[in-house]
């Protein structure tokens, strides 16, 4: 694809983020290019931080990136929701070993309504002043998979949606009363794939598009309540998460092939199937390994007096592609990037 070949060198440029600008540095090339668009929001770049961070509590979900520790260094009281805390597994043990009274792990499965309700009760009862509520909620619990539509089972679609979309909705609804008390923040981790579709990623894209829509609606509703809602749309950071190891990709592919209807296997053939799996392996190995732009985006959304509605921590290649895919006619963007 011509656009991919021409813009591939952009992958070698530093990760782009619209999170924070350093007043001491000159504008980046893309910022200069987009200055007329961004100038109206320029005052937000130098917005101050909220005060009394040390007395504010934040609940974080998803431990694949180290933002509980980063937010802890900012001075927040952290409640880290952990899927397997009761088993002493996963990231909860590492956080507990910090032996900090500001780092508190909580058993929380976003797919279990009763467990979510128990987490709300636990957080509410352990807040220093429950009437002041919970300052922030960071929704990042998620899973992913791959496979073209005809290769993907309905069970897989529902499994991914239950965690990524309904888990976000369920947890947000449960903790909103505490967030409203503090006039605090909701930060939902979406993805660039919540803005543009991608072949072989429909289960994931569907859920992230849903998170985007949910977050927009929530932002409209919460604005009169004084609650600010931000969306973080990371680019390709999959190489530093635990979502896709080579072994996991192979296991998913083998299971998918074994469960395909005979007519689908016959029509597509194993050669085509293996080619798509190989593309996924390449994608998983090509992402950025510096997650600091994502972590800084979350921190800015929680600490700035004027947080952004959307943050775009991603390579310039993906940022440019996202702008083209979302703003140009599909007849053009599809030709450039898909066909």
From Swiss-Prot:
It is found in: Mitochondrion inner membrane; Mitochondrion matrix. Coiled coil: none annotated. Homotetramer. Requires phosphatidylcholine as an allosteric activator for enzymatic activity. Keywords: Allosteric enzyme, Lipid metabolism, Membrane, Mitochondrion, Mitochondrion inner membrane, NAD, Oxidoreductase, Transit peptide. GO terms for biological process: steroid metabolic process. It is an enzyme of class 1 (oxidoreductase). The active site is at 204 (proton acceptor). GO terms for cellular component: intracellular membrane-bounded organelle; matrix side of mitochondrial inner membrane; mitochondrial matrix. Pfam families: adh_short. It catalyses: (R)-3-hydroxybutanoate + NAD(+) = acetoacetate + NADH + H(+). This is D-beta-hydroxybutyrate dehydrogenase, mitochondrial. Substrate binds at residue 191. The gene is BDH1. Signal peptide: none annotated. It comes from Gallus gallus. SUPFAM superfamilies: NAD(P)-binding Rossmann-fold domains (SSF51735).
């Amino acid at each position: 694809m011509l656009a991919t070949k021409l813009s591939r060198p952009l992958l070698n440029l530093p990760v782009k983020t619209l999170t924070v600008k350093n007043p001491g540095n000159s504008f980046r090339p893309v910022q200069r290019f987009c200055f007329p668009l961004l100038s109206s929001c320029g005052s937000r770049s130098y917005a101050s931080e909220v005060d009394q961070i040390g007395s504010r509590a934040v609940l974080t979900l998803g431990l694949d990136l180290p933002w509980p520790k980063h937010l802890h260094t900012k001075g927040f009281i952290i409640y880290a929701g952990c899927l397997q805390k009761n088993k002493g597994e996963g990231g909860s043990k590492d956080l507990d070993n910090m032996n900090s009274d500001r780092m508190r792990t909580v058993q929380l499965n976003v797919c279990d309504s009763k467990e979510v309700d128990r987490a709300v009760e636990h957080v509410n009862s352990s807040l220093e002043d429950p009437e002041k509520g919970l300052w922030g909620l960071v929704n990042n619990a998620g899973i992913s998979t791959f496979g073209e539509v005809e290769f993907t089972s309905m069970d897989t679609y529902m499994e991914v949606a239950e965690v990524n979309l309904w888990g976000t909705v369920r947890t947000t609804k449960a903790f909103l009363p505490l967030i409203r008390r503090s006039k605090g923040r909701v930060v939902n981790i979406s993805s660039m794939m919540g803005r543009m579709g991608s072949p072989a990623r429909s289960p994931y894209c569907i859920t992230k598009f849903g998170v985007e829509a949910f977050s927009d609606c929530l932002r409209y509703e919460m604005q009169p309540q004084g609650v600010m809602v931000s969306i973080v749309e990371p680019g390709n950071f999959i190489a530093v998460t635990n979502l896709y190891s080579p072994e996991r990709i192979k296991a998913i592919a083998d299971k998918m092939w074994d469960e395909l209807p005979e007519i689908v296997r016959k029509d597509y053939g194993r050669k085509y199937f293996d080619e798509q799996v190989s593309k996924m392996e390449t994608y998983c190995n090509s992402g950025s390994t510096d997650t600091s732009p994502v972590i800084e985006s979350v921190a800015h959304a929680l600490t700035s007096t004027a947080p952004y509605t959307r943050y775009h921590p991603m390579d310039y290649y993906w940022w440019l592609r996202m702008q083209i895919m979302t703003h140009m006619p599909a007849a053009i963007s599809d030709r450039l990037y898909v066909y």
